[in-house]
Amino acid sequence: MAASPYSIFAVQLLLLASWMLSSSSSNFNQDFNIAWGGGRARILNNGELVTLSLDKASGSGFRSKNLYLFGKIDMQLKLVPGNSAGTVTTYYLSSEGSVRDEIDFEFLGNLTGEPYTLHTNVYSHGKGEREQQFRLWFDPAADFHTYSILWNSKTIVFYVDQTPVREFKNMESIGVPYLRQPMRLFSSIWNADEWATRGGLIKTDWTQAPFTTSYRNFRADNACVWAAKASSCGLAAGGNAWLSVELDAKSRGRLRWVRRNQMIYDYCVDGKRFPRGVPPECKLNLHI
């Protein structure tokens, strides 16, 4: 039986309300749920700040109430100061189900005075193994910095303080699945001392616990909320130019600078890991 005009209108109102909610000023009470960790995850300052903590018993995490299908998402993070070795702070988009799409920022802790490793990965249709790692050009525990994901039908770009550090293009034309599932935003802190710092050689020093990461200024102004099997971007008048944005010449130059000066691992040049040849997308990504 065909849906009535009234039910269609109700769905449209729901989507418009979701879009307006996501475009308003950040409020963690409004936008997120604590996912795990109990009192280790705290929403403070009337919803303006979140802290996630890790102790020997457990880590903690939160997730967005909304699902997104394409978007530009920003969050400011201040990472664990001092001896953060063995800890991992995550900030990522992920779909539901076993054949997942995922866009990962992970911050691997280190000894006091040693740099964090920014670990990135992309899963498309359940396939990952696309790790790239970087050293940041600042201390991410000294102050808040902005980490952003641009995801549209043409490309995915990882940004740090508006500087692009990684791009994953739509390469369906050569048989590489692209990310097209609705995703939530997640963040967490947890213990990974079996691998996180120097391949697991440095273990977590629990005398330094609790380890705490802070979050503020979440923005999803340019993000398509997915609800009732429809996208809010079909209702928003204008403001969706980012849906077709790609890196311009200036941004591509900044990306090349990051790759030359800050990248410490790239799966696309790991011949030992891929003795039969690197994945097909690498042939395009090497020429940026």
From Swiss-Prot:
<keyword id="KW-0292">Fruit ripening</keyword>
<feature type="binding site">
    <location>
        <position position="199"/>
    </location>
    <ligand>
        <name>xyloglucan</name>
    </ligand>
</feature>
<dbReference type="GO" id="GO:0004553">
    <property type="term" value="F:hydrolase activity, hydrolyzing O-glycosyl compounds"/>
</dbReference>
<feature type="domain" description="GH16">
    <location>
        <begin position="26"/>
        <end position="215"/>
    </location>
</feature>
<keyword id="KW-1015">Disulfide bond</keyword>
<keyword id="KW-0134">Cell wall</keyword>
<dbReference type="GO" id="GO:0042546">
    <property type="term" value="P:cell wall biogenesis"/>
</dbReference>
<feature type="binding site">
    <location>
        <begin position="194"/>
        <end position="195"/>
    </location>
    <ligand>
        <name>xyloglucan</name>
    </ligand>
</feature>
<dbReference type="InterPro" id="IPR016455">
    <property type="entry name" value="XTH"/>
</dbReference>
<feature type="glycosylation site" description="N-linked (GlcNAc...) asparagine">
    <location>
        <position position="110"/>
    </location>
</feature>
<feature type="disulfide bond">
    <location>
        <begin position="224"/>
        <end position="233"/>
    </location>
</feature>
<keyword id="KW-0326">Glycosidase</keyword>
<keyword id="KW-0378">Hydrolase</keyword>
<dbReference type="InterPro" id="IPR010713">
    <property type="entry name" value="XET_C"/>
</dbReference>
<dbReference type="GO" id="GO:0009835">
    <property type="term" value="P:fruit ripening"/>
</dbReference>
<dbReference type="GO" id="GO:0030247">
    <property type="term" value="F:polysaccharide binding"/>
</dbReference>
<dbReference type="InterPro" id="IPR044791">
    <property type="entry name" value="Beta-glucanase/XTH"/>
</dbReference>
<keyword id="KW-0964">Secreted</keyword>
<keyword id="KW-0732">Signal</keyword>
<protein>
    <recommendedName>
        <fullName>Xyloglucan endotransglucosylase protein 8</fullName>
        <ecNumber>2.4.1.207</ecNumber>
    </recommendedName>
</protein>
<dbReference type="GO" id="GO:0071555">
    <property type="term" value="P:cell wall organization"/>
</dbReference>
<dbReference type="GO" id="GO:0071370">
    <property type="term" value="P:cellular response to gibberellin stimulus"/>
</dbReference>
<dbReference type="InterPro" id="IPR008263">
    <property type="entry name" value="GH16_AS"/>
</dbReference>
<dbReference type="InterPro" id="IPR013320">
    <property type="entry name" value="ConA-like_dom_sf"/>
</dbReference>
<feature type="active site" description="Proton donor">
    <location>
        <position position="106"/>
    </location>
</feature>
<keyword id="KW-0328">Glycosyltransferase</keyword>
<feature type="binding site">
    <location>
        <begin position="129"/>
        <end position="131"/>
    </location>
    <ligand>
        <name>xyloglucan</name>
    </ligand>
</feature>
<dbReference type="Pfam" id="PF06955">
    <property type="entry name" value="XET_C"/>
</dbReference>
<feature type="active site" description="Nucleophile">
    <location>
        <position position="102"/>
    </location>
</feature>
<feature type="signal peptide">
    <location>
        <begin position="1"/>
        <end position="25"/>
    </location>
</feature>
<comment type="similarity">
    <text>Belongs to the glycosyl hydrolase 16 family. XTH group 2 subfamily.</text>
</comment>
<feature type="binding site">
    <location>
        <position position="106"/>
    </location>
    <ligand>
        <name>xyloglucan</name>
    </ligand>
</feature>
<dbReference type="GO" id="GO:0048046">
    <property type="term" value="C:apoplast"/>
</dbReference>
<feature type="disulfide bond">
    <location>
        <begin position="268"/>
        <end position="282"/>
    </location>
</feature>
<keyword id="KW-0808">Transferase</keyword>
<dbReference type="InterPro" id="IPR000757">
    <property type="entry name" value="GH16"/>
</dbReference>
<feature type="binding site">
    <location>
        <position position="273"/>
    </location>
    <ligand>
        <name>xyloglucan</name>
    </ligand>
</feature>
<comment type="function">
    <text>Catalyzes xyloglucan endotransglycosylation (XET). Cleaves and religates xyloglucan polymers. Does not catalyze xyloglucan endohydrolysis (XEH). Overexpression in Arabidopsis transgenic plants causes accelerated dark-induced leaf senescence and higher lipid peroxidation of the leaf cells. Overexpression in transgenic tomato plants promotes fruit ripening and softening. Probably involved in cell wall restructuring during postharvest fruit softening.</text>
</comment>
<keyword id="KW-0961">Cell wall biogenesis/degradation</keyword>
<dbReference type="GO" id="GO:2000899">
    <property type="term" value="P:xyloglucan catabolic process"/>
</dbReference>
<dbReference type="Pfam" id="PF00722">
    <property type="entry name" value="Glyco_hydro_16"/>
</dbReference>
<feature type="site" description="Important for catalytic activity">
    <location>
        <position position="104"/>
    </location>
</feature>
